[in-house]
């Protein structure tokens, strides 16, 4: 345990290490749930619950894969496998920063089983930006330019979520 930031589970004792990086924190549940979001509900052969896809399902799958490899003697003697589970992936990766600073050693190769099966081969990315539009206040026609202000804007429950909806209210005045 790394002070609640992360934990690790290792099988094998080889010098070479393969890492599996996963996380167990989740973003807010948001609206639209047909089942309790923080309970695992099995419905029509699927598990529903906040974080079952991102990333608790992959954590459990990784544990089963590690057990299968060990039980079937598939891990070469020179290799070990380490599952690193973080608790702060959704809000800034402090878990990985802490782990990097305190772990005795890092894996030689790693992969992240985050998201849809069988594979996600890209990251959506994250960007913060300011949006502005010149209404002509600094031009020769400044007297005729409308005045506008965003009075309210809300989209999503967190900055790292794709929102289900966005709401923007504006105040615009212009002479007619």
For every predicted segment, state its role.
Residues 1-50, 71-79:
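Acidic/His- and Gly-rich active-site-bordering loop/insert found
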Residues 2-3, 22-24, 44, 52, ...:
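Fold-independent oxyanion-binding glycine-rich loops
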Residues 10, 86, 171-173:
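Short hydrophobic/aromatic beta-strand micro-patches
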Residues 10-12, 99, 120-123, 160-162:
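Short glycine-biased active-site loop of nucleotidyltransferases that positions the nucleotide triphosphate
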Residues 12-16, 104-106, 173-175:
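Short glycine/proline-enriched coil/turn segments at helix->beta-strand junctions
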Residues 55-136:
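Acidic/histidine-rich catalytic neighborhood of metal-dependent amide-processing enzymes
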Residues 122-124, 128-176:
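Acidic-enriched catalytic cores of C-N bond-cleaving enzymes acting on peptides and small amides
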